Amino acid sequence: MPPTLLLLLLLLPPSLASPDRDIYALAKLKAALVPSPSATAPPPLADWDPAATSPAHCTFSGVTCDGRSRVVAINLTALPLHSGYLPPEIALLDSLANLTIAACCLPGHVPLELPTLPSLRHLNLSNNNLSGHFPVPDSGGGASPYFPSLELIDAYNNNLSGLLPPFSASHARLRYLHLGGNYFTGAIPDSYGDLAALEYLGLNGNTLSGHVPVSLSRLTRLREMYIGYYNQYDGGVPPEFGDLGALLRLDMSSCNLTGPVPPELGRLQRLDTLFLQWNRLSGEIPPQLGDLSSLASLDLSVNDLAGEIPPSLANLSNLKLLNLFRNHLRGSIPDFVAGFAQLEVLQLWDNNLTGNIPAGLGKNGRLKTLDLATNHLTGPIPADLCAGRRLEMLVLMENGLFGPIPDSLGDCKTLTRVRLAKNFLTGPVPAGLFNLPQANMVELTDNLLTGELPDVIGGDKIGMLLLGNNGIGGRIPPAIGNLPALQTLSLESNNFSGALPPEIGNLKNLSRLNVSGNALTGAIPDELIRCASLAAVDLSRNGFSGEIPESITSLKILCTLNVSRNRLTGELPPEMSNMTSLTTLDVSYNSLSGPVPMQGQFLVFNESSFVGNPGLCGGPVADACPPSMAGGGGGAGSQLRLRWDSKKMLVALVAAFAAVAVAFLGARKGCSAWRSAARRRSGAWKMTAFQKLEFSAEDVVECVKEDNIIGKGGAGIVYHGVTRGAELAIKRLVGRGGGEHDRGFSAEVTTLGRIRHRNIVRLLGFVSNRETNLLLYEYMPNGSLGEMLHGGKGGHLGWEARARVAAEAACGLCYLHHDCAPRIIHRDVKSNNILLDSAFEAHVADFGLAKFLGGATSECMSAIAGSYGYIAPEYAYTLRVDEKSDVYSFGVVLLELITGRRPVGGFGDGVDIVHWVRKVTAELPDNSDTAAVLAVADRRLTPEPVALMVNLYKVAMACVEEASTARPTMREVVHMLSNPNSAQPNSGDLLVTF
């Protein structure tokens, strides 16, 4: 018996009857659970009156009693908790049979006394923030039985660590065991094979290792087994699992399995689901899998399987999902696949399949997803793919398909994505494809399509229309303006002629416009000004005439403008110098004239932007302007050019000096004044703690002084505080007032304060008043990854350490994206926001803060979505961020780890680390990943182990794909960093189908 429980029992008066003891335990439980301040009134557990007498406690919300007024069940599902813990007194409820405290974000540990409850049958602690080790049996003399009556235990999605609890044959009633989504380590105990009644085993999403025990094959009643995801086993699937005759679902995906797929699995006649994807399985698909007559879902994707799809799979008449993508399969797609009457999902992309797509595919009427991209398929696209009017995703890109696009696809109203790029398709595009009500992407680039665009266009949800590199001609119809959701319009390298229709101005969400390489004529329409979201415009290689419209200078977020190789005349609008967002300009090879402005954005453009315009002069152009054109202040050409260069230098020097002076003086004066005011208003401070803290708000305020500053950034100023023996980092948010009176801020920060993860910097609480918010974090003594990597100690951070830091940071981000409810997008992932503790373990910092900054920005932070050099390219033209934006930023961090270089600077004008790596590797005679990573690797380190470096490079390049949909999720990133063979380079848009 745990000593705590023994002490509790000794302290209770002998006269305390059992129901009264239950009331005492309930009072302790209520006192230990702190409701969220944002909870609705009345607060949770308000009816739990500690002064109640029996049997009033039986009416408490969530409490159930038996006929003797003994508590037999407690159900507190989704209780909105701010903090708290499970008290040891809960073990006094000796009649308790069902304890459910789920989805409450409950922190703390599982009390050691909990396993001693003699009647406990159902224990559900899932979806909380419980941490520490799970209690193990007391080894002392007279130990109480360990969960003697347990039938169900669900601790899914917590932060539990250590070894798995030692359940064994003594737990003869245990039917349901779910410990997934934690951080348990070590091997699966062999004793789990002695749980004779077990029907459900969930150990997925931990960090387990060792071999999968053969003893699990003795679980003859087992119906569902989930033991994959993040676990890293040695060896493969035990062939003995073929003896699990009752098994319905087997999920061993993403857990480093090797070896063949055991043919013995074919004996599992009741099996409904077999998931073995994202492993390193090799060999051929065993024909015995064709004996799985009940199978509905088969996923063997992302392995090293070879050979052909076995003919025996024709027996899988109940198959709904067949995923075999990213293997090394060859041969043709068997015709019997078209005969699967229940088939909804067929994904075979990225193999070496040849031949035609089965002609009858889709006739079954249930097909929803078809992805056969990146194979060597030939022949026509079958006409019946959407026969059942259910097809949603059609991806056939990067094959050798030929013939016309079937007209039937234009009538497929359920399609959301059509990707047929990089084939040899001919003929006109079916008019219906431009009017699909659900489609968000139509991609037909790099084919041999001809004809003209229809006069009727109206797909309300089409966000990307990609028709480049074909032979489509005629005019661009005015109806192109009837696509309200359109963000990217790509019509380059076709045969379009006539004017760019003014209706283009109706596209309010348009962010990228590319009509280059056509035969368009007329003026650049003024209506482009109505496309306020435009970030990239390419009108090059056409026959546009007239002047560059002054109205285009009103596009506030335009980053790229290319009007080269046209017939434009007149002068450059001087207002273009005020387009602060414009980073790339090309007006070359036109007939422009007059002076190039010598101010604003024009200071960053070089001569190549203006070449081929004999009438241009001044600025970076070699020809100097005559004195009259230069406004009477000219002189010799060399003098004018010298003046322009000097002006650039002067602007830079003045700006740099001013920034340093303001920062220095402001920091001294501002910090001093702020602290003085803080002292005067010390009573106005309020501290909200997310765990027990031994210091006060005033203690925190006293630490906020200039001598304690350890960092400054876009989110605020960071101070190192030491008070009452506690060491913490204090972040003073800039540009935001409101303090305790901002309920929205308080609620949001409270949400962040509930987050508990090993690789996330813990938010301890916050201190606020009317003007200021101070966030309190655990202190990380080794600073940031950026400081370490780019400072004098960067050379001491070896490849193994860099890979470990990458994996740890990825786990933290993965938790924010996939395991938080609601999910959290970081918005400012960078090496300076990855902090290192005393053991150099990585912790993600500043998560979720970007939304609190309002208009506050700094020289290194954009207004909304992150720091320069880390911002995903799509943000420039969508102004939206999502999880894939974080993935891109994380890819930049990986490139920093690989190269040892900062994300910007030292690469040339307008070049960041991503474009530099692409440029360097593209110029190599050897296009292997090994050659690529060696070409850009940090020269401070010895280039070994190469395999580890290559894996980091592969993952990095997948993360920084241009198209956000092509990037992996952070869950996939964690997997790839943990499983080197699964990191596929250049996967590009293939990942869009996940």
UniProtKB/Swiss-Prot annotation:
It is found in: Membrane. Disruption phenotype: Semi-dwarf with altered numbers of floral organs and rachis branches. Reduced number of tillers. It comes from the Eukaryota. Residues 1-17 form the signal peptide. LRR repeats lie at residues 73-93, 94-117, 118-141, 147-171, 172-194, 195-219, 244-268, 269-292, 293-316, 318-340, 341-364, 365-388, 390-412, 413-436, 438-459, 460-483, 484-507, 509-531, 533-555, 556-579, 581-604. Receptor-like kinase protein that regulates the size of the floral meristem. Belongs to the protein kinase superfamily. Ser/Thr protein kinase family. The active site is at residue 828. Expressed in shoot apical meristem, and after transition to the reproductive phase, detected in the inflorescence and the floral meristems. Expressed uniformly throughout the meristems. Expressed also in floral organ primordia, such as the palea, lemma, lodicules, stamens, carpels and ovules. GO terms for cellular component: membrane. Pfam families: LRR_1, LRR_8, LRRNT_2, PK_Tyr_Ser-Thr. Its EC number is 2.7.11.1. This is Leucine-rich repeat receptor-like kinase protein FLORAL ORGAN NUMBER1. ATP binds at residues 710-718, 731. Residues 704-978 form the Protein kinase domain. GO terms for biological process: cell differentiation; regulation of floral meristem growth; specification of floral organ number. The gene is FON1. Its main location: membrane. One of its GO terms (molecular function) is receptor serine/threonine kinase binding. Glycans are attached at residues 75, 98, 124, 129, 159, 256, 315, 352, 495, 509, 514, 562, 578, 606. The chain crosses the membrane at residues 647-667. The keyword ATP-binding applies. Keywords: ATP-binding, Developmental protein, Differentiation, Glycoprotein, Kinase, Leucine-rich repeat, Membrane, Nucleotide-binding, Receptor, Repeat, Serine/threonine-protein kinase, Signal, Transferase, Transmembrane, Transmembrane helix. It catalyses: L-seryl-[protein] + ATP = O-phospho-L-seryl-[protein] + ADP + H(+); L-threonyl-[protein] + ATP = O-phospho-L-threonyl-[protein] + ADP + H(+).
